[in-house]
């Protein structure tokens, strides 16, 4: 399958892409149901994800495809791809290689938990750093 945007499959048209041609994506660990991260995909990224069974996102800052783990080795093997009821959010059920999904070296990007009250609360890191980011991105 080619991923030239002119020849992408018709099933991609069911997804409700935003004005920038992107759709939000949630990566969830298949074995534990832990929410690992949030990212974006364009049509090419979603097609590549289906084709390779590895998570491929679209980096808005780099304006290019981002093959999860291309620098860190922390790839996501895709077990299942789902589309929500409004057809505007994609869920990937993945196996997270090495257990690290976040660029901070943690298991999940959602490692900060709100504790306290509206008047006196704060975000607290509740997941440990599994690997120093300095050693992940050399």
From Swiss-Prot:
Listed A to Z, the keywords are: Amino-acid biosynthesis, Cytoplasm, Histidine biosynthesis, Hydrolase, Magnesium, Metal-binding, Zinc
- Superkingdom as given in the UniProt entry: Bacteria
For biological process, the GO terms are: L-histidine biosynthetic process
Pfam families per record: PRA-CH (PF01502)
UniProt binding sites for Mg(2+) = 84, 86, 88
Q: Which InterPro entries match?
A: PRA-CH, PRib_AMP_CycHydrolase_dom, PRib_AMP_CycHydrolase_sf
Listed GO CC annotations: cytoplasm
Q: What is its main location?
A: cytoplasm
Q: What is its EC number?
A: 3.5.4.19
Q: Name the pathway.
A: Amino-acid biosynthesis; L-histidine biosynthesis; L-histidine from 5-phospho-alpha-D-ribose 1-diphosphate: step 3/9
Query: Which compartment or compartments is the protein found in?
Result: Cytoplasm
Task: Specify whether Hydrolase is a keyword of the entry.
Answer: yes
Q: How does it assemble?
A: Homodimer.
Chain's role: Catalyzes the hydrolysis of the adenine ring of phosphoribosyl-AMP.
HAMAP family this protein is in? HisI (MF_01021)
What is the protein named?
A: Phosphoribosyl-AMP cyclohydrolase
Q: What lineage is on file?
A: Bacteria, Pseudomonadati, Pseudomonadota, Betaproteobacteria, Burkholderiales
